[in-house]
């Protein structure tokens, strides 16, 4: 499966500013509901990922929901109320959560923090060739967005995992 998951506020740097929180949310979700990350890149305001789920399991929505919820909860738990998450660090504070960010009435009723776009885009990968195209898309996306000149310069990408020499255990 290929995914694009986006923050509600285009131009935010929250995902890269808070990469440790995001990585923790992904790791915890993987422990509870296993999946394999074929490729993943975290940009300041969105994520591209290619995942393989266990045979017979297609519940990727629950996994993304858990990742989003854990990330958001981590921000809320450490917040200094009244500060926007993207501005708190510039002001010398720990990350904050601003409950006054513009949220639709339905998001307010559901307690949605207004950090994430409500849904995500997914695409079922049809074959190995398409899988490789989508993996390459993940890895080259920071270049496409002008964040780096070479994909290996972007620190928040599985390209580093995929270019390391493989180590095998010899029994």
Residue ranges of predicted features:
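Short catalytic/metal-binding and nucleic-acid-binding patches
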Residues: 1-171
């Amino acid at each position: 499966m290929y995914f694009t998951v986006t923050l509600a506020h285009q131009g935010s740097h929250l995902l890269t500013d808070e990469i440790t929180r995001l990585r923790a949310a992904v790791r915890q979700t993987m422990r509870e509901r296993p999946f394999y990350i074929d490729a993943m890149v975290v940009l300041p305001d969105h994520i591209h990922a290619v995942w393989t789920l266990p045979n017979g399991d297609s519940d990727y929505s629950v996994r993304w929901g858990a990742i989003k919820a854990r990330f958001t909860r981590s921000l809320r738990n450490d917040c200094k109320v009244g500060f926007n998450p993207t501005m708190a660090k510039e002001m010398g504070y720990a990350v904050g959560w601003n409950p006054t960010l513009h949220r639709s009435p339905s998001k307010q009723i559901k307690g949605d923090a207004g950090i994430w776009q409500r849904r995500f885009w997914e695409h079922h990968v049809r074959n190995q060739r398409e899988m490789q195209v989508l993996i390459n898309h993940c890895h080259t996306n920071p270049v496409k967005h002008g964040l780096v000149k070479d994909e290996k310069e972007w620190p928040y990408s599985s390209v580093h995992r995929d270019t390391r020499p493989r180590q095998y255990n010899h029994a």
